[in-house]
């Protein structure tokens, strides 16, 4: 039984940046550091940061005056930003992924131009809530669609003044179907100049396609509330392979491995490599031998943390 490792897998640039912001803030300002929502959707990462002094909250009212506050990688609405600015905080850092911010700017532009905006995304996801919360033009409107059926039932005010954008962590295939439906129903609708689904989502889904072709079963390391991790497991199943979304190696069942020759392993963009390594060790204890790294798209994108954190971090390292 052999282990095939998808490439790329695991952390993306936005996740690295968000975690680094929390870690740097803890080092510079000391605990507690308040973070609105889980900084990334991974239980291991969140628990590790919580042990080090991060406090995860859902409402700005939960943050005491004089505190350090960080927005999560998923982004927040204009209303939440206004609430935070109205508080007597020591300092505020925004860990929103720059690629999510790109979509925010698209919605803001639509709002200012009086265009109706249609967001393709999953209801209730914090990224969607933050993105829709950029729109404040009461004379037009912003709408959420999750399926082709939603598109067919959608009612807008002006079919000639529409634009659309997407959540960054969607299924590439599903999104293509929905955008095609939008363009068919609203021929004059305008889409983003560059795809809103982020490079990491696209690359990891392509890697899972290739992994599924060579594997008898696929394990996706990622938490249940991770959108991009769920999409990877769904894609493997669409490829006709048994697929399991696991938080850690403790979730692996030995009976999954019966009659399996090749086990595919990948990880969502918010899952750290330490979890993948533990999965490999557990699989080897259950009879797997070598692990093989598959070829894949090289990623070299880096997003810098805020300048103030970089300066202070340098001062600490030099002292």
UniProtKB/Swiss-Prot annotation:
PANTHER family: 4-HYDROXY-3-METHYLBUT-2-ENYL DIPHOSPHATE REDUCTASE (PTHR30426:SF0). Dimethylallyl diphosphate binds at residues 41, 74, 125, 226-228, 270. The keyword Metal-binding applies. Coiled coil: none annotated. [4Fe-4S] cluster binds at residues 12, 97, 198. The gene is ispH. This is 4-hydroxy-3-methylbut-2-enyl diphosphate reductase. Homodimer. Pathway: Isoprenoid biosynthesis; dimethylallyl diphosphate biosynthesis; dimethylallyl diphosphate from (2E)-4-hydroxy-3-methylbutenyl diphosphate: step 1/1; Isoprenoid biosynthesis; isopentenyl diphosphate biosynthesis via DXP pathway; isopentenyl diphosphate from 1-deoxy-D-xylulose 5-phosphate: step 6/6. The lineage of its organism: Bacteria, Pseudomonadati, Pseudomonadota, Gammaproteobacteria, Enterobacterales. Isopentenyl diphosphate binds at residues 41, 74, 125, 226-228, 270. Belongs to the IspH family.
């Amino acid at each position: 039984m052999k282990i095939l490792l998808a490439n790329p897998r695991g952390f993306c640039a936005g996740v690295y940046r968000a975690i680094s912001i929390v870690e740097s803030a803890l080092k510079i300002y000391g605990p507690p550091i308040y973070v609105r929502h889980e900084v990334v959707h991974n239980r291991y990462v969140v628990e590790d940061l919580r042990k080090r002094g991060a406090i995860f909250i859902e409402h700005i009212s939960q943050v005491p005056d004089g505190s350090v506050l960080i927005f999560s990688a998923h982004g927040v609405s204009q209303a939440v930003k206004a609430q935070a600015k109205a508080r007597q905080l020591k300092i505020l850092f925004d860990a929103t992924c720059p690629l999510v911010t790109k979509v925010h700017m698209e919605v803001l532009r639509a709002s200012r131009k009086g265009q109706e905006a249609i967001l393709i995304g999953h209801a209730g996801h914090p990224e969607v809530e933050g993105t829709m919360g950029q729109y404040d033009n009461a004379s037009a409107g912003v709408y959420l669609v999750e399926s082709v059926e939603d598109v067919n039932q959608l009612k807008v005010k002006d079919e000639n003044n529409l634009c659309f954008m997407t959540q960054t962590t969607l299924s590439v295939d599903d999104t293509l179907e929905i955008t095609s439906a939008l363009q068919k129903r609203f021929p004059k609708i305008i889409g983003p100049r560059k795809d809103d689904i982020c490079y990491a989502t696209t690359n990891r889904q392509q890697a899972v396609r290739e992994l599924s072709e060579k594997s008898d079963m696929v394990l996706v390391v990622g938490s249940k509330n991770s959108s991009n991790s769920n999409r990877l497991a769904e894609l493997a199943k669409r490829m006709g392979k048994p697929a399991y979304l696991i938080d850690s190696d403790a979730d692996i069942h030995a009976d999954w491995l019966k009659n399996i020759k090749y086990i595919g392993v990948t990880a969502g963009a918010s899952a750290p490599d330490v979890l993948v390594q533990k999965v490999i060790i557990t699989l080897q204890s259950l009879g797997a031998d070598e692990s093989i790294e598959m070829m894949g798209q090289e990623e070299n994108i880096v997003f810098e943390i805020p300048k103030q954190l970089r300066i202070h971090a340098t001062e600490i390292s030099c002292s």
